[in-house]
Each structure stands twice: as C-alpha cells, then as structure tokens.
Swiss-Prot record:
Keywords: Hydrolase. Its EC number is 3.5.1.2. The keyword Hydrolase applies. This is Glutaminase. Pfam families: Glutaminase. HAMAP family: Glutaminase (MF_00313).
C-alpha cells in the first residue's frame, strides 16, 4: 500500500465514482431498504496504527445486512472451531445468494457461510448457545467498533414479512438435518441479525482484527487467533461478494464482504480496513458505486493483495 495522503485519495475516489451513480437500484425485495435515497455515499478508512479518515455519509447508519455474517461466523468459529465445517462448506457457490437448486443437489449442505443458506446454518449453531443470536451478533459488532449498536425494528419486520425464500431454504436444511432448530425461529433470528444498523466508520473499526492479525486496536485485545484471521480473509476473498466474487477480485483484489443495504467492507491485511456505502446495487446485489470506489482506492494506493 503506497504511503499516500488518505484524505487526498478519498477526495479523488469521490470524484471518480460520480459517473456510476444511477447505474443500479436499491434492494426492492426488502421494502424498507427501497426507501433509502440512491445518491447516498460514504467511505471510511481505518489504519491499524490508529489513523482514521472519512468522506461523505460515512457516519450515517444503514442496514448492513449480510456483512453481519462475518460477525456471526467469527462467533461460531470461536466457539466451535473447525466443527462448524461439518455444517457448511468453504467453496464459492457460483449461484445467487438465496438460491435453492445447489443446496438441494448437495443434500442441504451450503457451499459457504456467506450465502443465505450458510448464514442460516451459522445462526442455527449460535442458537445452541443463546436464545437471541441476533443480539449476540449485535453486541459482538458493538464490542469490535467500541460503540453501542442497534437493530432497526422496521427493517427487521419488513425483511421477515418477505422472507419466503429464506423460509424455503431453512425448511430444506431442516429436512436434510443441516439445522436442528425450528426453521421459522432460525429465519426470524437471521432477519433480525441482518437488520443491524452501522455506519462506514463503525464497520471499518469493527473489521480491524482482520487487518491486524486478529488483534482489535479498539478493544485492545486479541479477538481471533492469527490462523483463524487468515482463514476468514481467505473466505472473504473467495466467497464474500456472492457470485460476482471473481469479478470483484479482478477489479479490487481485496478480501471483502458486501450486503444488500449497499455496504462493502474490504480488508488490507497488515494495513487497514476500508468501508464504503452506496445503496444502488448491481444485479448480483452488490453496491455499484461501492465497488467502483474500492476499485479506485485499490488502484491509487496499490493495495491489492493479488
């Protein structure tokens, strides 16, 4: 990563992404997300040495959605270790994040923990240790960013009311024995988890352990073993952006996780985390402007790991 002025880099990125506004649209299958203005844009960079830089709407909270899957997986791995991989795989899916056909063909075992089926399996695991896995994920995210976080009840209600595909996924996995709890309870917990609200600044802080070998500069303690940190980053690089992960790796070259709320968090191992938010999505469910911003940031700073 080049030693550049990060504020200058962010200012340049903000100019470079302007032509990309209007090329996507906010998620409309969760009605509450469809109400967010498409022109929003925020970006935050947090260095492992403590420097922090933001631009635009970086302090505005938004629905982080699937980005919470990283927190949930970290919790499950810290509690179960490699046993989690008996319930979910580690391979890219090559199919949409809420697809059923591959899950049925592979006997109810999800390809990876970042598609919806995999995240539901992780939620089922967390239900073995807590009655409220969404609150556990919320509190873990708050611990990592050093602030109290909230689940948006309006988003949670909207999401659960339209979660028919996730109900089908959970029911299939229950029939195959991948999950052990009531499918409706698993889906309800998962929808609440996804309704967590965070800002770009908070996300950049929360993901710092993945850039710092498992150590959280915010909490001032080791959150993940270094070996686990490497493995989480490997999963983010290969599975974090759904079925456009190859294109994202080609353009950006960083481990990252996206969410249909328009957020993306990327990790520059040993250096920094970068969080970006813009609600207009491409056909894969990833922020159009966010991807362009991370591509520009990666090229300007030469921070790609590839």
């Amino acid at each position: 990563m080049k030693a550049l002025s990060i504020p200058d880099v962010l200012a340049e990125v903000a100019v470079l992404v302007r032509p990309h506004f209007g090329k996507g649209k906010p998620a409309d299958y969760i009605p509450q997300l469809a109400t967010v203005p498409g022109g929003k844009f925020g970006m935050a960079v947090r260095m492992v040495d403590g420097d922090e830089h933001v631009i635009g709407d970086a302090d505005e909270g938004f629905s982080v959605q699937s980005i919470t899957k990283v927190f949930a997986l970290g919790l499950a791995l810290n509690r179960l270790g490699d046993e989690i991989w008996t319930r979910v795989g580690k391979e890219p899916s090559g199919t949409p994040f809420n697809h059923l056909s591959l899950l049925e063909a592979e006997q109810g075992v999800p390809r990876n923990p970042f598609i919806n089926a995999g995240a539901l399996a992780v939620t089922d695991v967390l239900m073995d240790v807590t009655r409220d896995p969404a609150a556990l994920v919320r509190d873990f995210g708050g611990f990592l960013c050093g602030e109290r976080l909230e689940i948006d009840p309006a988003v949670a209600t909207s999401e659960l009311a339209h979660a028919w595909q996730n109900r089908a996924i959970a029911s299939l996995m229950r029939a195959k024995g991948t999950i052990t709890h009531d499918p409706e309870a698993v889906v309800a917990a998962y929808c609440r988890q996804c309704a967590l609200s965070m800002s770009c600044r908070q996300l950049a802080r929360a993901f710092l352990p993945l850039a710092a070998g498992g150590f959280s500069p915010i909490a001032q303690e080791t959150v993940f073993p270094e070996r686990l940190t490497r493995r989480l980053n490997a999963l983010l690089l290969t599975c974090g952006i759904y079925d456009s992960v190859g294109s994202f790796a080609y353009r950006v070259g960083l481990p990252a996780k996206s969410g249909v709320g328009g957020g993306i968090v990327a990790v520059v191992p040993g250096k920094a985390t970068v969080a970006v938010w813009s609600p207009e999505l491409d056909r894969f469910g990833t922020s159009v402007v966010g991807t362009a911003a991370l591509e520009a940031f990666s090229q300007i700073t030469n921070c790609s790991v590839l």
